């Protein structure tokens, strides 16, 4: 059974909640919602959140000001029974999720990660081994162009895709490995192309799927 249709205001709040989770890693407070939408009182935000909960879009958790959980549509989940696309080697200059890069589908629900995983990327090399991301592992990735300092990102630098920890410092972007034998990649976006393709939201160990 499909979920009930949202009003324009409810859709605006739902989209803001999702965007806030994607960009900060946590749901917004009622005060933050009220400020963003233009409500005079957090109580107005609370009433709209209750409506979203009744319609099956979110779950409200008691005892915390950020107690909002996005719910997965059962029909959307059923439409993705094949699981998450598994991305292998990415050819230079092509979109990371181009059909030719999809080696298979891995039977895992993207909603088990927070935020949701959109695809799995096969890790090549040990540049992130100090934080347990090893050669051959499957990195669960949430597709987004926004990332904060300290997050592990999938980045495209010129024509190469790499997994590193992000640091923005002044005009430069540093992509740090988690391996003492390697040096960071330093990018000046004024003269070099760089794009954030997604953020890491989990790891599936290589011996768990081989």
From Swiss-Prot:
One of its GO terms (biological process) is DNA replication. Its EC number is 3.4.21.88. The record marks 92-93 as: Cleavage. It catalyses: Hydrolysis of Ala-|-Gly bond in repressor LexA. Keywords: Autocatalytic cleavage, DNA damage, DNA repair, DNA replication, DNA-binding, Hydrolase, Repressor, SOS response, Transcription, Transcription regulation. The keyword Nucleus does not apply. It comes from the Bacteria. Residues 30-50 bind DNA. One of its GO terms (molecular function) is DNA binding. Pfam families: LexA_DNA_bind (PF01726), Peptidase_S24 (PF00717). The active site is at 127 (for autocatalytic cleavage activity), 164 (for autocatalytic cleavage activity). Represses a number of genes involved in the response to DNA damage (SOS response), including recA and lexA. In the presence of single-stranded DNA, RecA interacts with LexA causing an autocatalytic cleavage which disrupts the DNA-binding part of LexA, leading to derepression of the SOS regulon and eventually DNA repair. Belongs to the peptidase S24 family. This is LexA repressor. It comes from Actinobacillus pleuropneumoniae serotype 5b (strain L20). The gene is lexA.
